[in-house]
Amino acid sequence: MNILFAGGGTGGHLYPAVAMAAMLKEMVPGVELSFAGTASGIEAGEVPRLGYRLHLIPVRGLKRGRSLSALLSNIGVLTDFAASLFRAAALIRRERPDVVVGTGGFVSAPVLLAAQLLGRKTLIQEQNAFPGLTTRLLSILAREVHVAFREATGYLMKKRGVFLTGNPARSFPQRDSSIGREAFGFDPLLPTLLVFGGSRGARAINNAVLRHLGRLTAGSNLIWQTGALDFGRIEKEVSPGRNLWIGAYIEDMGSAYAAADLVLCRAGASSIAELTNLRKPSVLVPYPHATGDHQRHNARALSGPGAALMIEDRELENPEAIEGVIALLHDRERLQMMGAEAGRLSAPEAARILAGRIIDLAEEH
């Protein structure tokens, strides 16, 4: 059995594919797994590190906006897409995958389209409440489309073969909070806030935390992943302390989640899947420039039933926003209620279900 995953650019598009690949290895010994991605995406480093083959497809994304520069750039993108489609078709002919699985990002479009034109079976896994352009266009020819949020189905022209499956996410061992806090050298009795901004960081969140760092670490622990882009700047202004851990990237995310009573982060689909699977209450700050404003759709899917609070990016300038986070961190009863609601939205078996569907498609004749 040969399965090709197409997706990446950010962790939100890559990690669901990685979770499905890991489950396929467990369920089908000897399965051949490879990934198509770009040299500039997170997959360029992560996929080889995880031991999978990576096929590089040069592709650029469309620029948003109506300016002349955006128009000229997009003309070039469309020209480049033809070359990307040709490269993707050559890859499909060479690898002869039984199923091509698309998880979003720029690279998924030429690879999925090439597979469909060459008669290969395709499955699309859509992480967001508002589906990306590739999903909306190519779902029509896909054998199956699996969505993480019920809201996503309303944006698809395809109606048959669409399933509400949830997002496959990284799995973490269940650990007691005291063990997680011990891993960061923290006082195990203090409430703990975990802050991160996705694989690239989040400047607005980082600036808000930096402005209110004294309040955030007064009577509580703080685990703060700044992202690589901001770490150098923040490192010059902040030193780790007894109840502060700061770094560009958290290697031991399992301990970080275990330690946390509350999580402050962007509303990326992979993060939301991890939060709900682990029953973690959260404060979600949607990235305001996300394609189709999909992060706001994601955040509302959790804030509506009470599993999370949603704060707009611009509201982080207001001191009351961080004061609200601090108050929530110390409200144990409300945190428990939010965690229970998060658990009701979880899909811990998503990776196994999707792997099963991929296997079924691969074995069809």
Swiss-Prot record:
Its main location: membrane. It holds the Pfam family Glyco_transf_28. This is UDP-N-acetylglucosamine--N-acetylmuramyl-(pentapeptide) pyrophosphoryl-undecaprenol N-acetylglucosamine transferase. It comes from the Bacteria. GO terms for molecular function: UDP-N-acetyl-D-glucosamine:N-acetylmuramoyl-L-alanyl-D-glutamyl-meso-2,6-diaminopimelyl-D-alanyl-D-alanine-diphosphoundecaprenol 4-beta-N-acetylglucosaminlytransferase activity; undecaprenyldiphospho-muramoylpentapeptide beta-N-acetylglucosaminyltransferase activity. It comes from Chlorobium luteolum (strain DSM 273 / BCRC 81028 / 2530). Pathway: Cell wall biogenesis; peptidoglycan biosynthesis. Its EC number is 2.4.1.227. CDD domains: GT28_MurG. Signal peptide: none annotated. It is a peripheral membrane protein. Cell wall formation. Catalyzes the transfer of a GlcNAc subunit on undecaprenyl-pyrophosphoryl-MurNAc-pentapeptide (lipid intermediate I) to form undecaprenyl-pyrophosphoryl-MurNAc-(pentapeptide)GlcNAc (lipid intermediate II). The lineage of its organism: Bacteria, Pseudomonadati, Chlorobiota, Chlorobiia, Chlorobiales. It is found in: Cell inner membrane.
